[in-house]
Amino acid sequence: MITKSVLILCFFCSTFQIGFAQEIIPYKEVDTTKLYMEVIYPENMQEEESYPAMVFFFGGGWVNGARSQFEHQADYLAKRGIVCFLVDYRIKSQHQTTPFESLKDAKSAIRFIRKNASEYGINPHQIIAAGGSAGGHLAAATALSQGFNESTDQLDISPVPNALVLFNPVIDNGPGGYGYERIGEAYPSFSPLHNIRAGAPPTLFLLGTNDNLIPVVTAEYYQMVMEKVGSRCDLILYENQPHGFFNYRNFEFYQKTVQATDDFLQSLGYLEKEPKVEIK
């Protein structure tokens, strides 16, 4: 696996810039559209061991965005021992699609990773879905929304992740919530807040108090409903921070949210305290 990754890395680096990726793989084809994910592996992986996986979905309102958004977070977490995946999905600006197709793709990505867990050296029972804004919606909805499955997927493979890390996620698509004008009457089955149920995966919810899209009161209500059904939801509020505060360009809060992610994953037993890695 690692030899293959290095060969692919060398090939792609000779042709164009791919950030931190060690491998770029197609995971889905719809008509003439191919969707890809980048894989970032920990160093010195042992064949006899399996590793947690973290799947990142970029933000952009299901309209714009790029899978490179979380490459710095993925690079750090790979050094900590997690196999990280940066996932493409269909968006309106490129594919003239709706948010419903975006969610279908997110579920396809989780299924693909779980199905091929042994090939990538991962534990299929330790898959963490993560994302920011609309990407946070997709991460949460893979766990909570029971519809919006691609008919060509292998539907007996679960798309439900084992944990969630949500960066100012869109979690309310109901009337008054983000995206309602596009989701419309489908919101009861599409909106994560409206689909919380027993067994929902443990969740880390990171939010700035000055977020103009995700009200703090909505996040607090989400946490309350999660706890009511017996699921863990750690809500961390960052004073005076706006929407998108966690991105790499806002380095102080990039570091803080990465450390919070590390601490959360340690608490689940997905990471050990060592090796210590500088967040940079």
Labelled PLM ranges:
Residues F20-E49:
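N-terminal cap/lid segment of alpha/beta-hydrolase-fold proteins
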Residues R67-L86:
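Short amphipathic alpha-helix adjacent to the substrate-entry channel of hydrolases
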Residues N212-T218:
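Conserved alpha/beta-hydrolase "acid-adjacent" motif
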Residues F205-L207, D211:
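Short beta-strand/loop motif that positions the catalytic acidic residue
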Residues T97-S118, T257-Q259:
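Alpha/beta-hydrolase active-site loop
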